[in-house]
């Protein structure tokens, strides 16, 4: 019961916890109010991967270019760079998990966070930590790194913008099996609250769903839905039969630029190390 109380307390002010600050302020009588420190967002992003350097130098123009060449994204700042303020995140659940040790039970908190721009990009992050705030922060970063493109389609005539899933897709995690079925325009999302949140964040307006297994296990339910959404690009439908002409990978295309910037950065680091402090 004590653990549940802690979780409820932690989930009241999610935005404050995720920002790493308490949702309350307290000071002694006569004490001067403390000024908040600089936010992490104010710091300039210094990329540490080749992909990050290309993105910051505007050599890669969109996320779709990264997905086209299946380049792994290792820095969450890349997602912030392209999607920025369009991204919205929501904590699906915070649950206590315990491990039996010789000293007794060790309790940690597990956070499930969904993130998306409501327009074709969605991600899911899971993180376990000693503190609720740290778990939420870590889950948000992992959700950004796991963001996938969502393919949308039509139920009948191709009128207006795509509004539903392009075909029937199935996702699975543990005993949970989630099936997404195209629906007519105006139907809405017919599903349980957890898949509904993920589908809305993915930008799908109309969809029928079918779920089997132990859907009370929220983690598996969310992961199965995310798996189903990721499979929308797995089916090669007739409109994708045209031969794709691939160009060089960005790593090959901008080899000279990467070598130049890498040399410059390494020289700066060497000079900084040589200079007396």
From Swiss-Prot:
Residue ranges of region Disordered?
A: 18-40
Cellular component GO terms, alphabetically? cytosolic small ribosomal subunit; nucleolus
Domain of life of the source: Eukaryota
Biased composition regions of type Basic and acidic residues, renumbered to the chain: 29-40
Which one of the record's GO molecular function terms can you name? structural constituent of ribosome
InterPro entries from the xrefs? Ribosomal_Su5_D2-typ_SF (IPR020568), Ribosomal_uS5 (IPR000851), Ribosomal_uS5_C (IPR005324), Ribosomal_uS5_euk/arc (IPR005711), Ribosomal_uS5_N (IPR013810), Ribosomal_uS5_N_CS (IPR018192), Ribsml_uS5_D2-typ_fold_subgr (IPR014721)
Which positions fall inside the S5 DRBM domain? 87-150
* Location of this chain's protein in the cell: Cytoplasm; Nucleus, Nucleolus
The biological process GO terms on file are: translation
Q: Which UniProt keywords apply?
A: Cytoplasm, Nucleus, Ribonucleoprotein, Ribosomal protein
Q: What does this protein do?
A: Component of the ribosome, a large ribonucleoprotein complex responsible for the synthesis of proteins in the cell. The small ribosomal subunit (SSU) binds messenger RNAs (mRNAs) and translates the encoded message by selecting cognate aminoacyl-transfer RNA (tRNA) molecules. The large subunit (LSU) contains the ribosomal catalytic site termed the peptidyl transferase center (PTC), which catalyzes the formation of peptide bonds, thereby polymerizing the amino acids delivered by tRNAs into a polypeptide chain.
By sequence similarity, the record places it as follows: Belongs to the universal ribosomal protein uS5 family.
Q: How does it assemble?
A: Component of the small ribosomal subunit.
Identify this protein by name. Small ribosomal subunit protein uS5
Record gene name: rps2
């Amino acid at each position: 019961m004590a653990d549940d109380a802690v979780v409820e307390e932690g989930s009241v002010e999610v935005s404050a916890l995720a920002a790493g600050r308490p949702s309350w302020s307290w000071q002694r009588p006569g004490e001067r109010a403390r000024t908040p420190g600089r936010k992490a967002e104010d710091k300039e992003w210094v990329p540490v991967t080749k992909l990050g350097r290309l993105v910051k130098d505007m050599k890669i123009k969109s996320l779709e270019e990264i997905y086209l060449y299946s380049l792994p994204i290792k820095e969450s700042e890349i997602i912030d760079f392209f999607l920025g303020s369009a991204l919205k995140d929501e904590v699906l659940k915070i649950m206590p998990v315990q491990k039996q040790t010789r000293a007794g039970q060790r309790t940690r908190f597990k956070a499930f966070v969904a993130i998306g721009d409501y327009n074709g990009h969605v991600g899911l992050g899971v993180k376990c930590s000693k503190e609720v705030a740290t778990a939420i922060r870590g889950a948000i970063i992992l959700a950004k790194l796991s963001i996938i493109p969502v393919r949308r389609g039509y139920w009948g005539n191709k009128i207006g913008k795509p509004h539903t899933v392009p075909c029937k897709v199935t996702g699975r995690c543990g005993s949970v099996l989630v099936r997404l079925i195209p629906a007519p325009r105006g139907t809405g999302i017919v599903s349980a609250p957890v898949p509904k949140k993920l589908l809305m964040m993915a930008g799908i307006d109309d969809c029928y769903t079918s779920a089997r297994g132990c859907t009370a296990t929220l983690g598996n339910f969310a992961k199965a839905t995310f798996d189903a959404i990721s499979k929308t690009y797995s089916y090669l439908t007739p409109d994708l039969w045209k031969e794709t002409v691939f160009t060089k990978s960005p790593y090959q295309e901008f080899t000279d630029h990467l070598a130049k910037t890498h040399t410059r950065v390494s020289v700066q680091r060497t000079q900084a190390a040589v200079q007396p402090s």
